[in-house]
A protein has these predicted regions:
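Beta/alpha (TIM)-barrel catalytic core signal, keyed to glycine-rich beta->alpha loops juxtaposed to Asp/Glu
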Residues: 1-176
Length: 177
């Protein structure tokens, strides 16, 4: 990667599903050997806290240690499944357990409270809960470039207004209280 950076073919690179320890080790190696360090990470983060990973080897950065690490280093985060597998689209209902991966990874009382709060703020701001979920990511205290994987074009249409939604510190805290 370093040769491509030096040749100007890329301007930044990083890791996906890497632990923060592995990321730091790679950057220590880069520094010790005069190479370009990693500047971005693609691990999971969403307003809905994940309780399991969809596949072996996946990494989250929702824990306090990872959040502090991101704030301190200002590493750009490209969170995959930033819409929590459609949790905020209306697909997630406590009584509907037909999507076993959604249930395994995201169903919890805490996340359904977050969904209710996202719905409340969405109604007040004239957007959908998916837009609030996107705005929450964009208001983190480090660079975030959320990756969404909509199943339908309607999910893109309801999410993108989140690019313009402003959330106060109080609203950010309310969503995760």
């Amino acid at each position: 990667m370093n040769e491509h950076f030096k040749a100007g073919r890329i301007t930044a690179y990083g890791g996906s599903n890497w632990s923060i320890e592995r990321f730091d080790e790679a950057n220590a190696y880069a520094e010790a050997n005069g190479k370009q360090p990693f500047t971005l990470l693609s691990n999971h983060l969403s307003l809905a806290r994940a309780y399991d990973v969809p596949w072996a080897g996946c990494r989250h950065v929702a824990d306090d240690e990872s959040q502090q690490w991101l704030r301190e280093r200002q590493v750009a985060l490209f969170p995959w499944s930033s819409q929590a597998r459609g949790f905020f689209t209306g697909r997630a209902k406590p009584e509907d357990t037909s999507d076993s991966e959604l249930v395994r990874c995201f169903y919890s009382d805490e996340n359904f409270r977050r969904l209710d709060r996202a719905r409340e703020l969405a109604a007040a701001k004239g957007v959908e809960p998916t837009a609030i979920a996107l705005a929450w990511l964009l208001h983190q205290p480090y660079p975030v470039f959320p990756l969404i994987g909509p199943r339908h074009i309607s999910e893109t249409r309801t999410s993108t207004p989140g690019l313009s939604v402003t959330l106060t510190d109080e609203e950010m805290a309310y969503l995760t209280a």
